[in-house]
Regions:
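An aromatic/glycine/proline-enriched structural segment found at the starts
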Residues: 18-83, 187, 242-257
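Active/ligand-binding-proximal structured segments within catalytic/core domains
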Residues: 76, 87-100, 108
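Conserved, carboxylate-rich catalytic/transport cores that coordinate ions
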Residues: 8
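Short amphipathic C-terminal alpha-helix that caps PH/PH-like domains
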Residues: 34-35, 95, 154-159
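In a subset of proteins, long, contiguous C-terminal domains/tails are tracked
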Residues: 221-257
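M16 family metallopeptidases and their MPP-like homologs
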Residues: 16-22, 71-83, 109-219, 235-244
Length: 257
């Protein structure tokens, strides 16, 4: 606790702070209140950004026992060397949306949740930094411990299909519509919009960046999406971690047999 207090005292302050407000408010009133609350809160030390480094991590596959837990948890992750202004980023974002980001309409959800009934919830995400070449592909699922092997096999199969066979033209066109609508809905939320505008202040961007990105999405071809997925999402490099009461699941299986 003393270390945390010292860190706060040595580094915290509003000298480099940014404030973004969205909604119905009085600008003069907010400006006066901001000065009243933060003008004297000076940062003890100058701000220095810590650069994030990409690391190609050797894949691991491990299971951890969590006794007496009814549900098991599956996590998969892959580090990707890419930034969000890379020409391939839009293709990867749309590819992930079709793979696991589009919830019930995604391939992972269709296969693992709806078709095979192996998971209560499954999905994936793809993110990339705006400053450094540090991106990541991430997937997760909640499931019954006895379904561990089947779920992992289905996950690997869908990753393999996405990176070798790719997506169809019909899938890509449908995904464009859904993905763009989700971004529009997100911007309609004041909290999301304020957060985006605040980060853009730091990045020296405007909403024009979003407009250009969404234009890229509209113009993507299946070939571009499939090429990007094959280039960046390497199945053999994905780390998989599972946690659950697998011992009890094995005992139940023995009893049934």
């Amino acid at each position: 606790l003393d270390d945390a207090k010292k860190f706060y005292k040595d580094f915290y302050g509003a000298s480099n702070g940014q404030l973004t407000i969205v909604g119905d408010f009085d600008e003069k009133e907010i400006s006066a209140l901001t000065k009243q609350l933060f003008a004297d809160w000076k940062s003890p030390r100058p701000f220095t950004r810590i650069k994030q480094e990409y690391h190609a991590i050797a894949p691991i596959n491990k299971s951890f026992e969590t006794p007496d837990k009814a549900n098991a948890f599956f996590i998969a992750r892959l580090n990707v060397k890419i930034r969000d202004d890379n020409p391939d980023y839009a293709a990867l974002a749309l590819g992930n949306y079709m793979l696991g980001g589009g919830f019930l309409n995604s391939r992972l959800a269709t296969r693992i949740r709806q078709k095979e009934g192996l998971s209560y919830g499954v999905g994936s995400s793809f993110n990339a930094s705006s400053l450094d070449e540090t991106g990541s592909f991430f997937a997760n699922a909640i499931y019954a411990p006895e379904n561990a092997d089947k779920l992992e096999a289905a996950f690997r199969d869908e990753i393999r299909k996405a990176t070798t066979e790719g997506f169809t033209a019909e899938e890509v066109e449908a995904a464009k519509s859904g993905y763009l609508q989700s971004r529009q809905l997100s911007r309609a939320q004041d909290r999301e919009l304020a957060g985006r505008l605040n980060s853009y202040l730091y990045l020296d961007r405007t909403i024009a960046f979003d407009a250009a990105f969404e234009e890229q999405i509209k113009n993507l071809t299946p070939a571009q999406v499939n090429a990007a997925m094959k280039k960046y999402i390497t199945p053999d490099s994905i780390t998989i971690i599972k946690a659950g009461d697998f011992a009890k699941a094995k005992e139940k299986l023995k009893t049934v047999q």
